[in-house]
Swiss-Prot record:
Enzyme Commission (EC) number: 4.2.1.33
Role this protein plays: Catalyzes the isomerization between 2-isopropylmalate and 3-isopropylmalate, via the formation of 2-isopropylmaleate.
Official protein name in the record: 3-isopropylmalate dehydratase small subunit
GO cellular component terms listed in the entry, alphabetical order: 3-isopropylmalate dehydratase complex
Length: 214
């Protein structure tokens, strides 16, 4: 897995809440467990017209987002069924970072991302950042008035910098285990191999009757 330390890219905005995994990658593309070829199918039902042409009414098809790699969207992104294909599609469509807001309802704070989706992004080297709705609104406003707006994400110091006419920097918080995993480019297999010696020692001292060897 490619390590993630810093990333600079064009921001694209998707002004929709509760984007579920079926919207990210529809069910007809789930027949394969290969991890390749999903990029063009990301947001398929929104992205294309009935005859398969790019839909000019879908916001991510707008020319001002050409070359985008940072997606800024609304609350509860990645909800719905637990399909890792959704993350594969986003990564293969060029996204390295997704930014969304938590939502305050009374005394409750609703997370920006669905739990399983968030876990799958970490496994695939994608960074998800939670910010307040106020900050997300400001980024939407800047992006609307500044085509090709870029941002830099620095995971080492946990800062997002918007390179607008008036630059702005926002701190963010990432769970330390997730941060370490992304910075070092460790997938689940690599994480296990870090403890290879301990695993081998455990296997060596484990009683043989436990696995039916006696």
């Amino acid at each position: 897995m490619k390590p993630f330390t810093t990333h600079t890219g064009v921001i694209a905005t998707l002004n929709r809440s509760n984007v579920d995994t079926d919207a990210i990658i529809p069910k007809q593309f789930l027949k394969s467990i290969k991890r390749t070829g999903y990029g063009p199918s990301a947001f398929y039902d929104w992205r294309y017209t009935a005859d398969g042409r790019p839909d000019p009414n879908f916001e991510l098809n707008h020319p001002r987002f050409e070359g985008r790699s940072i997606l800024v969207t609304r609350n509860n992104f990645g909800c719905g069924s637990s399909r890792e294909h959704a993350v594969w599609a986003l990564v293969q469509d060029g996204y390295r970072v997704i930014i969304a807001p938590w939502k305050e309802i009374g005394e409750k704070r609703l997370p920006a991302f669905a739990d399983i989706f968030l876990s799958n992004t970490t496994k695939n080297g994608m960074l998800c950042i939670e910010l307040s709705e106020t900050i997300i609104d400001a980024i939407f406003e800047q992006t609307a008035s500044q085509p090709g707006l870029q941002a830099t994400v620095d995971l080492t110091v946990q800062q997002l910098t918007i390179h607008g006419r008036i630059p702005a920097t926002y701190p963010f918080q990432i769970e330390e285990g997730v941060r370490e995993q992304l910075i070092n480019g460790l997938d689940e297999i690599a994480l296990s191999l870090k403890h290879e010696a301990d695993i081998a020692a455990f296997e060596a001292r484990r009683p043989t009757w436990m696995d039916g060897r006696d």
